[in-house]
Structure formats: C-alpha cells, structure tokens
Amino acid sequence: LRANQFRRHKSHVIVFFIFIVSNCGGLLTPLGDPPLYLGFLKGVPFWWTFYRLIPIWALTLLILLFIFHLIDDRIFDDEETHVRGSLIQTIQEAQQPIHIEGWANVFCLGGILTTVMLSGYSLNPYLEAHCGAWASALSRLIQIAVMLVFAVVSYKRTPLVIHEENQFGFGPIIEVAVLFFGIFGAMIPALTLLEAKGQTIAITHPWAYFWLSGFLSSFLDNAPTYLSYASLAAGQHGISPSHLGDLASQYPKILAAISCGSVFMGANSYIGNGPNFMVRAIAEQARVKMPSFGGYMLWSGAILIPVFILMTFIFF
C-alpha cells in the first residue's frame, strides 16, 4: 500500500494480492494455508503438497501474474497521461525507499512456524498415543497458546513508530473475527449434512472433487471444507479419515484436486478465506476504495474461473 501511495488507482493491486498471496500462493506446504495444515495433522506428509502440487501452483501463479502485469501496465500508462509530471519519476524520487524494519520479529515468526511444524510432527502424534479422543483439542490448545505468546512478544517488542508508519490497528482483526464467528456458526449445518449424506453422493472423478470443494470454499471457510471432502473421499475408498496419508499415497490425484479446490477457490469471494476480508479491511483503513462483495466476485469470476477451468483440463 505504501509502495503504491502515489497512484490514483490501487484497488486492482489489492485484488490480485488477495488472489495470489492470500490464497493461490499458499498451495505448496501446510504452512501456506489452513486446509493443508489440517491434512498434515491427519497424516499427509509435510512435503507431499510441494512435490505433488508444484506444477499446478507454478502455472496458476504464472498466468495470474501475467494477467496482473497486463492490467497494471494499462492502468499505470493511463495514469501517466492524466497526472502532471512523471509518475515514474515521482516514485523513483521517493524520500523513503522500500526497506524492512523490525528484524527482531523474525525470531517470533520463526517460533510460530516451528510451533506449527512440531504440532504435526511430534506433539499431535504424542497426544494421540496418550490422550485418545482429547488429543486434537489439546494439540490445538497448546499450539494456540504458544502462538499467542509469540504474538504478544512481537507486539510488545516492536517500536511504536513502526506500528504508526504501517498504520497498524486491531480494527481489521476484530472485524474479521466477528464475521467468521458468524460464518462458522452458519456452516455447521451444511458440513454436518455433507458428512451425513456424503456416502450417497456419487463423486468419482478428481475434477468433481476440485469444483465441489472449491464451490463450498468460496462461501464457507476452506479449512473444514477440505477436511469434509477429504474424509468423504477416504471413506469412499475404504480409508480411515484419520489417516489421510493413505489417501495421498493411493489416490494422489483426488487429494490434489481437493487441496487445489479448497486453497484456490477460497479466493472467489471475500468470505472464502479469513485473510481476504482482513486484507480488504486493511486496504479500506488506508483509504483505498475496494470493490463491494459482488464487485469483487466479478473480478474473481472474470479472472479466476477461466484459470481454474484451464487447470481442470490440464491436471484433473
């Protein structure tokens, strides 16, 4: 936002940020998106997503970046003809070039990533062996507590001037928390119905899993949607939903389709993935006029859906 502060039209930059950074870019590892992390906790190998999904990830991002380049170039050239002086020169002569501050927070970020990885590699298996049915809840509780400690340390140790320069505030976080509390309540009946009637749904092809998981992920949270469809696929093939690693090894194309549908199509609407709405709230706090809910879906429908159709024909 600060790098583009001199520009008149910035909303397209934020829209593509949501497409690429908040959603599609997180496909490679369980650290990138909650659906993949839930799969990791259920036995999917950590590096399986990297080795299996990197061609899909690379082609999708290449196409999206190319489309963004075309759109941004067109808008930038149009701005150049309507501003006094050179916009490029204004940006190049900015008094404060792009730089990074707050390097101490790298330790806290590393601590959070380590916590996430250890939860899947050691903590979760240990608790399952000793705590039975309480293992999942205890694992999440411990993980959340440790991550909160790192978050508080990061917030307290960061100089106030950095927060002020980045216009940091808790408003967007609170707004997203309230919204998704309501979404989680609304999605429980839909997911319960899917689990109860899932065995009667005749889904056999990977492309069907891709689009069905993607459709629900567009309007419900993508993490439980992923788990529901992965469990459905496992049950249809005689695999325990608690051991999705077997699904990854025996039916990799199906799990790949569910993974891509859940991660990619979370970008189809503001409520498909938690970061989407948070990015929008942060942008609006910085006085960037963002598309409405329907307006954003026009962007995603015009850009993402054709890309996903292409991915279907190539990979699924």
Language-model regions, residue ranges each:
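Membrane-interfacial helix-loop connectors
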Residues: 1-9, 13-21, 38-54, 188-268, ...
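Juxtamembrane and boundary regions of transmembrane helices in multi-pass small-molecule transporters
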Residues: 6-13, 28, 47-94, 260, ...
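Alpha-helical transmembrane segments and their helix-start/interface "positive-inside/aromatic belt" motifs
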Residues: 10-16, 96-108, 167-177, 297-300
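Small-residue-rich segments of transmembrane alpha-helices in multi-pass membrane proteins
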Residues: 18-26, 85-93, 172-185, 210, ...
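Transmembrane helix-loop junctions at the membrane interface of multipass transporters and ion channels
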Residues: 33-49, 115-131, 315-316
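Intrinsically disordered, low-complexity non-transmembrane regions of multi-pass membrane transporters
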Residues: 71-107, 152-171, 289-290
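Hydrophobic membrane-spanning alpha-helices of multi-pass integral membrane proteins
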Residues: 103-115, 178-184, 257-258, 299-307
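Transmembrane helical segments that form the transport core of multi-pass membrane transport proteins
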Residues: 109-236
